[in-house]
Amino acid sequence: MAMMAFVSIVGSLSRQLGLAPWQAGMAVTVSGVLWMLMAPIWGRASDRLGRRAVMLTGFAGFFVSYCAMSGWLVAAMRVPMSVGLVFAGLVLTRGAIGGFYAAAPTASQALIADNLPPERRVAAMASLGAANGAGLVLGPALAAQLTHFGLEAP
C-alpha cells in the first residue's frame, strides 16, 4: 500500500517542490526498476539466509527508507533547497524503497512454496497476489484521502 501511495500525491508534491514532470516520473520509475533488479538478489539471499530473515530485513529497510523519504520531503517543503538536491534525495530514497520492497514478495512466495503442501500452494499464492493487488488500489486511494490534512500526511 505504502509504495504506491506516493503515486497519488507525486503530481501535487512535485509542483510544490518545483520539480519538472520528468523528475516526478523518474521518482516513480526508479522504485520499480530497483524492485525488478533486486528481486533475484533477495531471492538468492532468502535461499542462503532464510525466508523470514530476508522478509524482516526487507520490511525494516522499506520502513526506514519510507521514513527517510517522508522526512526528506517534509524538509524540502519547509527549508529552501535546490531542485537538484530535492530530486537527488527523492530518487535515492525511492530507489531504496523499491530495492527493499523487492524482498517481500520474493521471500513470501518462497515461504509459501517451502511450507505449504502442493494442494494449498495455489490458493496461498493467489491470496498473496490478491493482497498485493488490494494494496496497489487502496494505497493511492488512502493517500488521496489523507491529503485533506496536507501533502505531508500520506
What are these regions (language model features)?
Residues 29-43:
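Central cavity-lining transmembrane alpha-helices of secondary-active solute carriers
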Residues 29-33, 60, 126-134, 138:
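Transmembrane alpha-helical cores of Major Facilitator Superfamily
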Residues 60-83:
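C-terminal ends and interior cores of transmembrane alpha-helices
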